[in-house]
Amino acid sequence: MMALSLEYQKYLIEKMRIYALFGGGISMENAKNRPPFRYDIVGSFLRPEALKEKRETFAAGKIAAEELKEAEDAAIRDLVAKEKEVGLKAVTDGEFRRRYWHLDFLAALEGIEEVGAEKWSVAFKGAQPKATTVKIVDKADFGDHPFIEHFRYLQSLAGDTLAKMTIPSPSMLHLICCVRATDYAPIKRYEDEARLYENIALAYQKAVRAFYEAGCRYLQLDDTSWGEFCDPEKRKAYEARGFDLDKIECAYVTMINRVLEAKPADMTITMHICRGNFRSTWFSSGGYEPVAEILFGGCHVDGFFLEYDSDRAGGFEPLKHIKDQRVVLGLVTSKTADLENKDDIKKRIEEAAKFVPLDQLCLTPQCGFSSTEEGNILTEDDQWKKLRLIREIAEEVWQ
């Protein structure tokens, strides 16, 4: 039998201590002040026009990187102040330094390269993002990654408020490079796909430790793979290409759980499941039934941020597979300016509570307001109205 490292032995001892104290659940009194919170956010915010202009001039080669960074720093400083003002218990940097919610992080991993593309890797139901993608060119690893410094700056602004960091789920690297890409051919190192899954998991374990050492205690994995696997049409298309989606789903859950082995006891890691969010449009539709048992029943994240702002997400019945995690209901859309009716949202929370105890439920926008630098079709004022509404509802439901 393989001997466990001293570091892993210490981790197991601490894990057992926490379970002895709290029974492994989230409903204990000591866990109530931990994220995700009763009213929370997914992560991205609309970029100010001044920042958009700076990014355009930088892309055109008219200003230096330092000038762009100064503009980003100022915009993030203003954003964090507004997040605190609206009463958020966890703040993000709005993803203001990114072009895309996922590709900037993935392309900065070792062994991963951003490349041009004829079209986006999945088709939206309307406007399409600027075409680019990533590919695996060498061993996937986490090295000197710029997102650690991004987090440190956010942490310096957060003060007594919790700083939340969002990154793409490890599933996204495999999905984009190996599933969506019709011309994928593994490099020699990864002809055995199990080795690829393991390397991605190990890279993300390093990421978890690096963020933790930088002070991060609230990390979110953003993931559109599950949204795609909920879509009947996409399932048929992938299966027609020879993919066994049940096998892939199990591999993804196993990989994510492997990543979570590196999570210290006082760190929260959640997952946001998305069906696409670009210029107020989407690319997937379908309830959670096809993935619920594998994902909700097997993935060990601390909470799930789930889209539920339209009938494209189906009903709440699949939530019966949830264990003791928190479920953050995305009942308020981030795609349009229309302000939801407070009573309607409360009724939907009551419906969800038939399948998950109310004490495990929270409320959030269905997605970020700007998953790419272009942003959804609403105003900054609209996004703050949405967050104030969410806080009001949460305070009335969970008094």
Give names to the regions the model predicted:
Residues 1-2, 16:
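Methionine residue identity
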Residues 24-399:
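Domain-level signal for soluble alpha/beta catalytic cores
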Residues 10-27:
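Short, Lys/Arg-enriched N-terminal segments with co-localized hydrophobic residues
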